[in-house]
Amino acid sequence: MSQLQDSSIRQSDPDSDLDSDSNSNSDLGSLVDQGNAQFEDEYIATEEQTNLEPKVPLSTSIVLDKLPQDQQSQLNHNPYLKSEQKSQSREGTKFRMETVLPKKTTEKNENQHSSASTTKSPEKVTIRFQPIGSTTAIHPKVFKISSVQSILTVNRFLSQKLKNNERQPLHLYIQNSFLPSPDERVGDLYALFATNHELIISYCNTIAFG
């Protein structure tokens, strides 16, 4: 009888071992499940937090990303940056000068051209003939002649008016002071010695001056 009880006890021992192993396995599985659930919760929370962060545009982030005060002061006192700023300012001044100077030069050239055009002799000039001494006077005394004509042409014209022959020379003077050369142009003399918009030419048959 005691032997049967011992065998029943021995036979029941493996069952108890299996139960204990199953219990331990179930406890371990529950711990693993809890760990996985906790990890998933943390991952989801982190992902949601990442998705909720606002995305700042690149241009705005550059503007907002300012340097600290000490680094900003270092940049302000950087000699390289100052020299670069000075060079840029010089280039800007040079550019402004280059853009202004041609305009002033053009205006100056225009003024010179206008002044030259005003002093330029007209196409025809007015000549007043004045006799010296007892030389015969002509009427009328005022004539208009082309500015490109020479003094030699004026001498021939006046000789025809006075009906002088070739043997009787005629001497012309400007402002009763000097004898112009025969090839000088009337327009050049008018530009230099005109009086009241007239070129006064004195004449006589003998040498009167010089």
Swiss-Prot record:
Record-listed cross-link Glycyl lysine isopeptide (Gly-Lys) (interchain with K-160 in ATG5), residues: 210
Gene3D superfamilies: Phosphatidylinositol 3-kinase Catalytic Subunit, Chain A, domain 1 (3.10.20.90)
Keywords: Autophagy, Isopeptide bond, Membrane, Protein transport, Transport, Ubl conjugation pathway
The organism's place on the tree of life at top rank: Eukaryota
Protein localization: Preautophagosomal structure membrane
Residue numbers spanned by region Disordered: 1-57, 70-123
GO cellular component: Atg12-Atg5-Atg16 complex; autophagosome membrane; phagophore assembly site membrane
GO terms for biological process, alphabetical: autophagosome assembly; autophagosome maturation; autophagy of mitochondrion; glycophagy; piecemeal microautophagy of the nucleus; protein transport
Compositionally biased residues, Low complexity: 21-33
One annotated GO molecular function: Atg8-family ligase activity
Listed Polar residues bias regions: 1-11, 47-57
Pfam family, one: APG12
Biased segments, Basic and acidic residues type: 83-97
Family membership: Belongs to the ATG12 family.
Function: Ubiquitin-like protein involved in cytoplasm to vacuole transport (Cvt), autophagy vesicles formation, mitophagy, and nucleophagy. Conjugation with ATG5 through a ubiquitin-like conjugating system involving also ATG7 as an E1-like activating enzyme and ATG10 as an E2-like conjugating enzyme, is essential for its function. The ATG12-ATG5 conjugate functions as an E3-like enzyme which is required for lipidation of ATG8 and ATG8 association to the vesicle membranes.
PANTHER family noted in UniProt: AUTOPHAGY PROTEIN 12 (PTHR13385), UBIQUITIN-LIKE PROTEIN ATG12 (PTHR13385:SF0)
Subunit structure: Forms a conjugate with ATG5.
Protein name per UniProt: Ubiquitin-like protein ATG12
Organism name: Lodderomyces elongisporus (strain ATCC 11503 / CBS 2605 / JCM 1781 / NBRC 1676 / NRRL YB-4239)
